Amino acid sequence: MTEIGREPKKKSKGNRAIRMNLFFLAVFVLFTALIFKLGVVQIVEGEQHEEDAEKSNAKTAYYPAPRGKMYDRNQKVAVDNQSVPEIVYVSTSSTKTEDKIKTAKRLASFIHIDTEFLKERDLRDYWIAAHPKKAAALLKESESNLKGDQAYKLQIERVPDQELKAIQQDDEEMETAAIYTRFSSGNAYEPQIVKAMNPNKSNSNGKNGALLDEKKNSSQRPKNDLTYDEISIVSEHLEELPGIDIVNDWTRKYPYDKTLYSVFGGVTTPDQGLLSDRKDFYLTRGYANNDRVGKSYLEYQYEEYLNSHKEKVEYVEDNKGNVVSQKTIDKGSRGYDLQLSFDMELQAKVEKIIEEEVRNSRARGNYMLDRAFAVMMDPNNGDILSMAGKKIDLKTNKIEDYAIGAFTTQYEMGSAVKGATVLAGYQDGIPHYKYYIDAPMLLGTNLIKKSYTNMGTINELTALQKSSNVYMFNVAMHIAGVTYKPHGSLPADQNDLLKMRNYYSQFGLGVKTGIDLPQESAGMQTTPKTVGGLILDLAIGQYDTYTPLQMAQYISVIANGGYRVQPRIVTSIHKPGKKDQLGKAIEHRKPKVLNKINNSESDLKQVQTGMKLVTSSGTAKNTFTEDVSGKTGTAETFYYGTNRNWWGKKTYNLTFVGYYPSKKPKVAFSVVVPSVDDDDKINKIIAKRAIHAYAELEKKHSKK
C-alpha cells in the first residue's frame, strides 16, 4: 500500500520542473525580444528618435521673401523688388526682459535710431523693464498678491513723471528705449525689424526705385535709415548682441518711376503691419502681425497672389529654452507675378501728353483746371491699355499721378453720351432717319431748351455730327411718352427717369464697370422730387455723372457691335520665373461679356456712321490724322473743387469718346477735362495726341 501511495508525488515533482523550465524559457525569450527591440531603437531608429526629440523642442521663425512682380502686356517689369539690408531681432523662449534691455543698450552704442515714434506708454514700459526693483517698489504691500496684469497696470500708472522726463532728456537712453520697443513688438521667434536701409536715399538722382549703391552714401539720414557704416560695426559685434542679425529684406521698385503709381497701390510698412479691418482674416491665413500687406488698389486686390512664401528657419532649444542649433528648412520664394493689360510705354506717353496739355490750357487762362483723364481700352476683350490721370496742386503748381480718379471720381459728361441716347431711342421705338426740327423748345412760361445754334431739320446722323440737343430732347420726351407743345408742361416722372437710366445702364453708364480694382464709383444719380425738364438734361449728359472709365466702356459697346465687356487690368497670374521673365501661368483671366445691348446691328451701324461724321465733318473735323470715330462733349457745370473761393463759379467739362480705327476698332478711349472754358480744345488735343501715340507704337511693335 505504501509503495503504491508514493507514485503521485514523483509525477508532481516532474510537472513542477517542466513548468519551471517553460517559465525560464519564456523569460529568456522576452528578454531576448526586449534586447532586440532596444537594439533596433538605439541603432536602427536612433537618429529618427533623436530628430523627433529635437522637433519637440524646435521653434520656427519666418523671414520675409519678396512680393510678386507686375509685368505689362509686353512683359516689361512695371513693379519690381529690390533687396534692402536691415537689422532684425529675434527673441527665444528663454529670453528675459533684462536680456532685451542689455542687448538694446549695447546696440544703441553702435547705431542711431529715430525716436519720434515713441509714445508715453512706450517710455513707461521701458522704464519698468530697465528698473525692475524700482518698479516693484511702486506696489503697496497689500497689492503684492495681485495678478500680473493687474499689478503691471498699477505700475504703469505710477511711473514717476520725473523718471519719464529724465529719459526724454537723455538722447542715448531714448534710443535705447526705441530699440527695446522694437524688440518687444512681437512674439518669440517672430523677427522684428529694428532699422532698415532706405533705398530712395541711396543715390544722387533721388528717383524712386533706383538700386542701392554698393558703397557708402552720405546722403542717407543716420537716424531714420540704416547706413553701411552701421551694418559694418554691428556685423563685427554680433557675438555681443544675442538675437540680433543682419538680413536682406525687400522694398518695391518702380522702373517707370511714378507712372501709374496710384493704380499699383501701396504696401504697409512693418510698423503698420496688417490692416486693422482685415487683421483676423490675415491671421487665420498664417500672417504675422508685422507682415506687410497690400493696402490699396492692385497691391490690395491681388494680395493673396502677390504675398510671398516666407523663408523658414528652425531653432532647436534645450530643456532650458536655450538655442542649441538653427537651420534653414525652407528658403521661401517670392509671390506670384501678375501680367497686366497696360502698355507701360503707351501709358508714359499719355501721361506726358496730359501733363503738357494741362499746363498749356492753364497758360491760356483756365485757372480752375486742376485735373484731366484719358482711358484707352481694347473694346473687344476689355484690356485697359492706358488709364492716365493727372492732378495739379493749385498752391504748389506740382502735377501728381491721379490715374485712380479715372474710376473713383465722376463728372457731367455732356454731349459725349448722345450715342447712348440715340440707341436708347431706337430701343424705345424711334425709327432710323426720324426727322425733328432743331429750334428752341419753350416749356412752361419761361423755360427755353435749345441747341447751341438752330440747325433746322435734322435726323440722328446730323444730330450726332453737329451735336444737336433738341434731337436728344425729343428722344427723352418719346421715352417719357410726352408730346411737345410750345409753352406746355413736361409731366415726366420718376418712372420715366428710371426707364432712361435703365437704357443707359446697358452701356455701363450709372453702374460699375466691374474693373478688378477696389473702390470703383458707379457715378452719381440723384432722386429729384420733381423730374420734369431734368429728363432732358439727362439726355444730353447734363444731369447724372459718370467716371472716365464708364465712358470708355460705353464707347467700347458701340465700337465692338453692342457688347458691354468687363474692363480688366490683370490678364494672367504666373509662378516666379527667371530674372525679368514671366514663369508658368497658373491662371488666365478670360474676357467677360457683361451684357449685350438691346439694339440691332443696323442700329449700331447707324450710330457708328454718325460718329464718323463727327470727326470727318462735324464738331471734331480736322482734329485727327488717323481714322477715328467719336463724339465730343461739353457740359455746363459749376466749380466745386479744392479752392473754396471759386465754389459756384460757372465752368465747363470738356470730353471726348471715340475709337480707332473706325472699322474693326482696336482701341476705344475717353478723355475728360473738368473746369475749363467751353471754347478750349484741350479734350480734342489730348484725344488726337493719345491716338497718334497709340498708332506710332502699333507701327513700332509690328516691325519687331
Curated annotation (Swiss-Prot):
Disruption outcome: No visible phenotype during vegetative growth, sporulation or spore germination. No change in antibiotic resistance. Double pbpA-pbpH mutants cannot be made, suggesting the 2 proteins have redundant, essential roles in vegetative growth. Depletion of PbpH in the pbpA deletion leads to cell growth arrest after 3 generations; cells swell, round-up, many lyse and division septa are very irregular. Germinated spore are spherical and eventually lyse.
Keyword set, alphabetical order: Antibiotic resistance, Carboxypeptidase, Cell membrane, Cell shape, Cell wall biogenesis/degradation, Hydrolase, Membrane, Peptidoglycan synthesis, Protease, Transmembrane, Transmembrane helix
One Pfam family recorded for the sequence: Transpeptidase
GO terms for cellular component: plasma membrane
Chain intervals for the UniProt region annotation (Disordered): 197-223
Any Gene Ontology biological process: peptidoglycan biosynthetic process
Induction behaviour: Increases progressively during log phase, peaking at stationary phase of vegetative growth.
Membrane spanning stretches: 23-43
Comp. bias regions, Low complexity: 200-209
Gene3D superfamilies given in the database record: DD-peptidase/beta-lactamase superfamily, Penicillin-binding protein 2a (Domain 2), Penicillin-binding protein, N-terminal non-catalytic domain, head sub-domain
Family designation: Belongs to the transpeptidase family.
The protein, known as: Penicillin-binding protein H
